[in-house]
Amino acid sequence: MAYVFEQMEATDYEKVNTKLKNRDSLDILRWANQTYGEKLVYACSFGAEAMVLLDLLSKIQKEAHILFLDTDFHFAETYELIERVKERYPTFRINMAKPALSPEEQAERYGDELWLKNPDQCCQIRKLDVLARELEPYDAWLSGLRREQSPTRANTEFVNQDKRFKKVKVCPLIHWTEEEIWMYIKLHQLPYNELHDQHYPSIGCTYCTKAVMPGEDARSGRWAGTGKTECGLHAPTKGDS
């Protein structure tokens, strides 16, 4: 069968995940590459998990499509890391996708500091709308989600029905622990965001990310004080598998 969103029912996801359940991350990437080919893209945050997934992906598809949601609000360290990734994996096709509105246009239309007044709307404009637009040519997208990251990610499967974007979402790292991620990074001497060494386990936009103190949840530095824990790219919707 064709593993595309429009042709797959919930039972089809169950079947393919049963088939793949004992495979490792490289096997999942091979399956995704063989299944989707040029219709597969990795929506990459360039976080710690991303460094592992990029390295694994380079062993399967050296000319993989990589999508970065360039909100215009990222840390300088994030942009510096992307340049290092380009040097290490020069054949990756990296798309730095920007929102329809510049920061100035957003401020003019919605007022200054939208990320404070309405963080959901800011994420919608600068991330979700961009991802929806950029995913159009593709049938499936890769993500570095891990089950242990948060309760909202605990039920993530290798192959997921993404009803928000109407695509198949493939997550090869669901069983990895944070310790394993960092062991792999150190073992293979991979580049990573220097902010990770400054108590930033999860890194997003400058205005919505702060350092996390020992004992705090790893994602507590994102949208701190707002009750918001996800930008919406991976927030589960009813009926998602």
Curated annotation (Swiss-Prot):
Cofactor notes: Binds 1 [4Fe-4S] cluster per subunit.
This protein's GO CC annotations: cytoplasm
Catalytic activity: [thioredoxin]-disulfide + sulfite + AMP + 2 H(+) = adenosine 5'-phosphosulfate + [thioredoxin]-dithiol
Residues forming the catalytic site: C231
Recorded superkingdom: Bacteria
Binding residues annotated for [4Fe-4S] cluster, in chain numbering: C122, C123, C205, C208
Oxidoreductase listed as a keyword: yes
Keyword Transport: no
Top-level class of the enzyme under EC nomenclature: oxidoreductase
Record InterPro entries: APS_reductase, PAPS/APS_Rdtase, PAPS_reduct_dom, Rossmann-like_a/b/a_fold
Pathway where this protein functions: Sulfur metabolism; hydrogen sulfide biosynthesis; sulfite from sulfate
UniProt name for this protein: Adenosine 5'-phosphosulfate reductase
Cofactor(s) required, per the database record: [4Fe-4S] cluster
Annotated keywords: Cytoplasm, Iron, Iron-sulfur, Metal-binding, Oxidoreductase
Entry's family note: Belongs to the PAPS reductase family. CysH subfamily.
Subcellular location: Cytoplasm
Organism in which the protein naturally occurs: Shouchella clausii (strain KSM-K16) (Alkalihalobacillus clausii)
Enzyme Commission code: 1.8.4.10
Chief place of localization: cytoplasm
An annotated Gene Ontology molecular function: phosphoadenylyl-sulfate reductase (thioredoxin) activity
